[in-house]
Amino acid sequence: MRKLSLSFGVLFLMTTLVAQSVGPKLKITPLRNNFYIYTTYNTYQNTQVPANGMYVVTKEGVVIFDTPWDTTQFQPLLDSIQARHHQTVIMAFATHWHSDKTAGLEYYRQKGIKTYTTHKTDELSKKNGAKRATFLMDKDTVFTVGGYQFETYYPGPGHTEDNIVIWFPSEKVLYGGCLIKGASDTNLGFLGDGNVKEYANTLKRLQQKYRNPQHIIVAHSDWNDLNSLKHSIEMAELLGKE
C-alpha cells in the first residue's frame, strides 16, 4: 500500500510539474469596462513568448485587435468570448503582417467575421505568404461600433514598414502592438523587417499625437506600465546612433 501511495504521489508531482511548465494556452485579463487583453503563446528562439491581443465588447458584438499567435487558439478565443460575454465576434483587425497578428485572419473570415488590415499590410502579407484580410484601409480610419469609437493610425515604419496602432479617444486606450515594447524590455525585439533609422521618429510622432494615454498595450511584454512608450523611444534613439 505504501508503494502504491508513493507511486501516486510521484505521478501527481510529475503531472503538476508538466502542467506548470505548459501553462494556459489562452489567458483573458480585464483591462477596464468592456476592454479585455487576451494572451496566447508561441515559441521563439527556444523560449515561450506571450502575444497580447485585445478585444472590446460592444452592443453590436465583439471587436478583436490582432489574432492569436497560437493557431490552436483561434476557436477557443471565440468560444471563451461567447461563454463569458454571450456575444459573437463581428470584426477583427491586424496591426501588421507578421503571423503573431495575422495568423487567424483567414479562419475568422470563414466564420463570417469581417477582417481588416491596411493596404500596405495586405501587400506585405501577399509577398510573404501571410494570411490576408477581406477589407483594406488605404488611410487612417475612424470606426464607430456599438457605442465605441476608435481610430487606426500609421505613425511610420518601425517594427515593420506597415505597423499601425489603435486609439480609443474616450477611454484613452492606446493599443500599440509590436511597435511599442514593454517598459522592462532591454531591446526592440526582432528587427529583420523593421526600419531602425526611422523607429525613434515614428514613436515620437505617436507620442505627440496621443498624449496622456491611460493604458498602453504592448504585444509581447507586461502592459501595465505607462513608461513603455517613453522607454521604447529611448531604446530606438540609442539603436539609431549605432
What is each of the regions a protein language model found here?
Residues 1-22:
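Bacterial Sec-dependent N-terminal signal peptides
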Residues 37-39, 55, 63-65, 90-94, ...:
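Structural recognition of the beta-strand scaffold that forms the well-ordered cores
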Residues 34, 56, 66, 81, ...:
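Divalent metal-coordination and catalytic microenvironments
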Residues 59-61, 72-116:
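Active-site metal-binding motif and surrounding structural segment of the metallo-beta-lactamase
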Residues 75, 79, 83, 106, ...:
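Solvent-exposed, polar/charged alpha-helical surfaces in well-ordered, non-transmembrane soluble domains
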Residues 22-31, 61-62, 69-70, 116-234:
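Metallo-beta-lactamase
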Residues 30-79, 165-178:
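Conserved beta-strand hairpin/beta-sheet module of binuclear metal-dependent hydrolase folds
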